[in-house]
């Protein structure tokens, strides 16, 4: 059997710790997350959690970052513009139907961030980046002549983030109430008609 490198062992440990954190968040919210419980859940000591992340805040920030990485596959290979925007809208909701504990934890934490001094700044920054990415796609689409000149990218971006996150939360709360794939297709068709030049 081939020995794993230090880096591979570290990545395996971090993945296990993030998964344990996500599971706790999904089950009971942020209040249930302690470094000791994360370590126990992952099969490690509290000390290893502290060693890897330093604090609960850093652990939660790492969870938020990891949960968003690659959530909507294939977008990085696309050029900015209307096509990328429409793919995001459809694929984001399509991905919701198959999300794992990391992404579920992201949505739970996003909802909790409204009343949390710990989470508020993290999610304000994340949402600002998400809106900026969407607005950049719309601006590129406008420059290419694919998006109407009177469209306000920042306003549309705020609406779209609310739609995507709101529909995802609805699915998380009541999975039988919404078909995420169908919702994604409907939202794509709506925005294609609303934005088209």
Regions found by a protein language model. Give the residues of each.
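N-terminal intrinsically disordered/low-complexity leader segments
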Residues: 1-12, 173
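Hydrophobic alpha-helical connector segments
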Residues: 62, 73-104, 153-160, 184
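Short helix-capping/turn signature of helix-turn-helix
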Residues: 53, 108-115
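C-terminal peripheral helix-coil segments that are non-catalytic and often amphipathic
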Residues: 1-2, 83, 87-94, 131-132, ...
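Helix-turn-helix
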Residues: 12, 16, 20-58, 62
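Short, basic, alpha-helical segments at the C-terminal edge of helix-turn-helix-like DNA-binding modules
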Residues: 65-70
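Amphipathic alpha-helical packing segments from all-alpha helical-bundle domains
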Residues: 72, 98-101, 117-144, 155-158, ...
